[in-house]
Structures are given as structure tokens and as C-alpha cells.
Amino acid sequence: MSYIGLQQDSGEYKIQKIHAREILDSRGNPTVEVDVFTPKGFGRASVPSGASTGTNEALELRDADPNRYGGKGVLTAVKNVNTIIQKELLGLDVRNQREIDELMIELDETENKSNLGANAILGVSMAVAKAAADSLNIPLYRYFGGSNAFTLPVPTMNVLNGGKHAGNELAIQEFMIQPKGAETFYEALQIGAEIYQTLGKFLENKYGRSSTNVGYEGGYAPKMGESTEALDALVHAIEEAGYTESEVTIGLDAAATEFYEEEFYNIDGKKLAAPELLDYYVELVNSYPILSIEDPFYEEAFEDFEALTNELWDTIIVGDDLFVTNIERLSKGVDMGAANALLLKVNQIGSISEAFDAASMASRNGYTVIVSHRSAETEDTTISDLAVAIGAEMIKTGAPARGERTAKYNQLLRIEEDLGEVAHYVQL
């Protein structure tokens, strides 16, 4: 039982002030940060942004002023928080998360939060949750999840980048390692970091120093042309670091919408139709220790997701752009058997309450839940607490490098320490 819910009015928990500001994210672009104050507590949250985004995501409001940040400023969203949203939320009980989220959604009056901006609404939603937890003097993961929050997710670490996250010829966007054989999250993080460092040395020796330049999420971005070349490098690094394929598996984020054009997929120098791409994935899974494939097809190709899920029934097929953390799209996927896992991104849907709804629907229907960052991040660690609170099987938050990525991993270390002997590392 979590602490979120309709609470009796108490002056100690009333929202006194909400203040938003424009800050920079990890790509050097503006984003929204929000502070929420009560007599007993304070919450601060900042909003991430994606590079490869689903068409059906909630709208991130940008100023479109070419004289500031190339049109990417967020002063309009900031103003919406400081005027419209603050006016409506002042005096409300900060513990009433759903009431507050629904009020903001009603204020916006659009399906995709395009009036106030999903970045404005989400910033307030996360800061409200943090202020509530602080006011109650309990950790955020405990506020979200109550006594059921005790599991630590398996990290799926993006250690080699392609696609929109890098400047090489790899079509597949992310090649990830998953230390699923660890006993604790602490051990999993150590395994991931050791493989990451080993991979870096291997790439430098084989491809030169420039191959260890990193992409948006901290993964290396060497000049590679084919997926098998990247997979061979990962297998080598896993073995060289002293681990086995049963201890550490591989995850792929194809982000296939990005290389889909006129009913064909451009990958590894080839132009493949959907059935050919399905065979390509099957061959990869049969050749490498691949546990998961994210967005293997175009974001509207529900039937192709269904076909691959049936073909690779013991592989985790993840819907990201397919579902965009939206319960209507997820419901369609569940009905069809399209994918068997949900990538949960709070900024795709735009509020904490709606993210919880999507996670709940996925879990009820036997889907794996993977909580995820975005390519443009901040030092905010809300998703770490969220992953523990909902019992997510995995968390995807980049390489064990770059401060905005390690912030999330380090927060999970603190949570595991705080939980003590009751902490349980997920076994996949």
C-alpha cells in the first residue's frame, strides 16, 4: 500500500508555492525544472527529453523562438507552471497526487498536453511527489510503493551506441549489457562497469582512440557498420571481463522507426521488408545471448510485433515507440499479443499517475516492465525510486558513465542500502 491517495485536508501538507525555471539538460538544450513547497517539505524535479521520439508521445512544449537556443527554449512551459498551474494548485494537499495530476490534465484540455506542455505538467507532477515524500519524511520509493517496494531492477546498460545516439553507420540504436546473474544491484553495477571499461580498452586497441568517444547516453560510438560487429565486441568484452553469457546477456534497442522508409528497413547496408527483418532478428537471437529487443519494427507495425513475439516467445520484445507509455496503445498491444514488455517513460505520457496506470496494466497482463530514462537527461533520480516502487524487472538508464546516468544508478545503490536485508535483486 503506497502513501499516495486522497488525504484529509491538513495545512501542513498544503502547497504553498510552485516555481519553475529553465535549466539545461545533458545535451545542452533547455528543459523545465520545478520546485514545490509545503510547510513541512520541498520537492524539486527536472524533466528529460528524447532524441528518437514516438509520434504519439505527449507534447514537449518549446518556444520556437529562433533567437534563443535555436528555438528550443522552454520559457512558455515555465510561464505556464508559474501562472496557470500554480494558481490552480495552491492550497491543495500535496499528498493527493492523482487529484493534482488530473486537475492539470483538465486544465490543459488536449489529448497530448500541447496547451500547457507535457514538460510543464510532468515537472510539477514529479516535484509534487517529491514534496509529499519530504513532507512525510519518507524516501520517495517508499512514498510511491509502500511496503511492497523492495525489489531492485536489473540494469540494462547502453554501452555501445548507433542510430540517432551516435555518428556511426550502425542502424540499431543501442547495444546493451544486462548483468542478470548478479546477487545484488551493487554487484550488478560492478559487473556492468567492469565490462564497460573492458569494452573501451578493446575498442581503442582495435579501432583507435576516437572509438571511445561516447554518445548521448554514455555508450561508446565506434565507427562500425554492421550489427554483428557490435555484438561481437560485446561478447568479447563480457568474456574478457571474466563473465559468462548466463551471467550477462545482451539487449538491443533497434528504434526501427528511425531506419524505416517506404515500407522497408535500411539496416547493415540492406533494404529489408518486415518478414526479412523478422528473420534477421531470429538469426541474431540464435547467434548471440540476446535477452531483449526493443522497438524491432516501425511504431505502428503492431502485427509485425505480434509475429516476432510469437516467433521469439522466450525473448523479451519491448514496446517503446509502439506504446509510448499510453494505456490505450498498450491495451491494443495486449489484445493482439504484440510485444511482451513495456518501456515506461514518464515524459512520454506526462504525469506520474498516468505512468503508474500504464505500469499497472502491463503487470496485470504479464508484461515485463522496464523503467527508462531519455537520451537528454538531468541529474534527477525520480525514475530510480519509481522502478523500485512498481517492482520493475529492469531499468534502462544508459552506460555506467556520465553524471546524469550514474546519478540514477547511484540512487539505486542508496535504496538497496536503505532496504537492507529485505532488498531483493530481480531474477530474470
From Swiss-Prot:
It comes from the Archaea. Mg(2+) binds at D253, E294, D320. Signal peptide: none annotated. It catalyses: (2R)-2-phosphoglycerate = phosphoenolpyruvate + H2O. One of its GO terms (biological process) is glycolytic process. The active site is at E217, K345. The keyword RNA-binding does not apply. Its EC number is 4.2.1.11. Keywords: Cytoplasm, Glycolysis, Lyase, Magnesium, Metal-binding, Secreted. One of its GO terms (cellular component) is cell surface. CDD domains: enolase (cd03313). InterPro entries: Enolase (IPR000941), Enolase-like_C_sf (IPR036849), Enolase-like_N (IPR029017), Enolase_C (IPR020810), Enolase_CS (IPR020809), Enolase_N (IPR020811). GO terms for molecular function: magnesium ion binding; phosphopyruvate hydratase activity. The keyword Secreted applies. HAMAP family: Enolase. Catalyzes the reversible conversion of 2-phosphoglycerate (2-PG) into phosphoenolpyruvate (PEP). It is essential for the degradation of carbohydrates via glycolysis. Belongs to the enolase family. This is Enolase.
